[in-house]
């Protein structure tokens, strides 16, 4: 009997149920991580970008070209394809199970059955539970990509540097930002274990810790500890090196902008967060799941979906580099979007601050934003804020 290509039929079903969106808002500009693509298909794109070594901002315009069959500008699709997209993986080095996890109520039934029947020695796939980790990895990877190659980088250049960066996220225990490292830190410090769904708060704490473990002078991480408050004195301490130089700093705002859905009063500020030149996207924000949001069009947000299981890299040695085919699995031109009213309110919002001038620019934009602010900038931490730890992680685990 001939084998049946189940994957082919699954792709057909997914296409029928989730067709690629068309540009049905031709009069609305399109945004992708701070870059604006105008509504006309032949026009200009604008970007607020670092125009000098001191970080002074100036506006630059670049002509756009033709649109594709769904009427999206090709330059916009090139931008989307150049973002790093990290998804579920399978057949990686097992992540050991904790000895007392046999009946863990935080684990979904599907994940529990899979762990008993297929991954009895440990988790060799994160399908069904790792989507928030993957979204967080995507956010961190794109922040690092911007620092390494610049916001204007597009696929087809600097392939060696891109592959080296991606290898830091490979699915083996030695990779500094692997899912193994996330799970290890989550178990030790965040009360999150293999097979459990991580929330935005735990993901932010893992990112901060894993970056700190590298001891790099190229990136630091500021997290808001489950509030929307950012303190200038605390940020300055984190972002300043011993010799006084500014170290690029990733700001992670873990927040909840409503109860079941994002409160409409926050819509404008949430969309503007993805329009800022410092934006590196949003992780979370989808009921019972997590996605990596990178763009805005009208009331819709574009996202990269981590819920696609791919084989882990065969290159497990820390000194290996990924092949061209493996690098391709970290990119897609396939657009997906969701109306802002359908977003889950629990999310992790990221901004990369590259210089003191960048900080001043970002702060000015935040303070002058529309609608209810999703970030509050205060001069110093004078109060002992004790946010409820569980609030930011109360998103139902994905069961698939």
Swiss-Prot record:
Catalytic function, reaction form: [protein]-C-terminal L-amino acid-glycyl-phosphatidylethanolamide + H2O = [protein]-C-terminal L-amino acid-glycine + a 1,2-diacyl-sn-glycero-3-phosphoethanolamine
Keywords, sorted A to Z: Autophagy, Cytoplasm, Hydrolase, Nucleus, Protease, Protein transport, Thiol protease, Transport
Molecular function via GO: cysteine-type endopeptidase activity; protein-phosphatidylethanolamide deconjugating activity
EC number: 3.4.22.-
Organism superkingdom: Eukaryota
Biological processes, Gene Ontology terms: aggrephagy; autophagosome assembly; mitophagy; piecemeal microautophagy of the nucleus; protein processing; protein targeting to membrane; protein transport
Active site: 131 (nucleophile), 305, 307
Keyword set includes Protein transport: yes
Top EC class of this enzyme: hydrolase
GO CC field: cytosol; mitochondrion; nucleus; phagophore assembly site
Main location: cytoplasm
InterPro entries per the UniProt record, alphabetical: Papain-like_cys_pep_sf, Peptidase_C54, Peptidase_C54_cat
Subcellular location: Cytoplasm; Nucleus; Preautophagosomal structure
Family designation: Belongs to the peptidase C54 family.
Function: Cysteine protease that plays a key role in cytoplasm to vacuole transport (Cvt) and autophagy by mediating both proteolytic activation and delipidation of ATG8. Required for selective autophagic degradation of the nucleus (nucleophagy) as well as for mitophagy which contributes to regulate mitochondrial quantity and quality by eliminating the mitochondria to a basal level to fulfill cellular energy requirements and preventing excess ROS production. The protease activity is required for proteolytic activation of ATG8: cleaves the C-terminal amino acid of ATG8 to reveal a C-terminal glycine.
Record protein name field: Probable cysteine protease atg4
């Amino acid at each position: 009997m001939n084998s049946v290509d189940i994957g082919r039929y699954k792709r057909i079903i997914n296409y029928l149920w989730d067709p690629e969106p068309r540009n049905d808002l031709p009069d609305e500009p399109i945004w992708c991580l701070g870059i604006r693509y105008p509504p006309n298909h032949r026009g200009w794109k604008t970007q607020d970008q670092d125009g000098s070594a001191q970080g002074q901002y100036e506006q630059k315009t670049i002509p756009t070209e033709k649109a594709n069959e769904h009427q999206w500008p090709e330059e916009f699709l090139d931008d989307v394809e150049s973002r790093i997209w990290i998804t579920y993986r399978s057949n990686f080095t097992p992540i050991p199970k904790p000895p007392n996890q046999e009946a863990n109520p935080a684990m979904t039934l599907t994940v529990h059955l899979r762990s008993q029947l297929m991954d009895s020695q440990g988790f060799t796939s994160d399908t069904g539970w790792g989507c928030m980790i993957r979204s967080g990895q995507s956010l961190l990877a794109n922040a690092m990509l911007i620092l390494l190659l610049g916001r204007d980088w597009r696929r087809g250049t600097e392939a060696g540097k891109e592959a080296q960066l991606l290898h830091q996220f490979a699915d083996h225990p030695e990779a500094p930002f692997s899912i193994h490292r996330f799970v290890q830190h989550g178990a030790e410090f965040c009360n999150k274990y293999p097979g459990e769904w991580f929330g935005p708060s735990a993901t932010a704490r893992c990112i901060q810790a894993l970056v700190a473990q590298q001891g790099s002078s190229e990136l630091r991480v500021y997290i808001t500890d489950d509030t929307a408050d950012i303190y200038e004195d605390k940020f300055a301490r984190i972002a300043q090196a011993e010799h006084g130089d500014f170290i690029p700093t990733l700001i992670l705002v873990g927040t909840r902008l409503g109860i079941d859905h994002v409160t409409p009063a926050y819509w404008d500020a949430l969309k503007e967060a993805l329009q800022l030149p410092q934006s590196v996207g949003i992780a979370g924000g989808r009921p019972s799941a997590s996605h990596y949001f990178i763009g805005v069009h009208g009331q819709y947000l574009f996202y990269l979906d981590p819920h696609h299981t791919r084989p882990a890299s065969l290159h497990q040695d820390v000194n290996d580099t990924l092949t061209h085919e493996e690098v391709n699995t970290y990119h897609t031109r396939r657009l997906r979007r969701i109306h802002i009213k359908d977003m889950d309110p629990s999310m992790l919002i990221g901004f990369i601050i590259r210089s003191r001038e960048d900080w001043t620019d970002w702060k000015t934009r935040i303070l002058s934003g529309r609608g209810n602010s999703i970030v509050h900038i205060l001069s110093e931490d004078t109060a002992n804020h004790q946010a409820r730890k569980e609030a930011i992680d109360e998103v139902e685990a994905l069961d698939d």
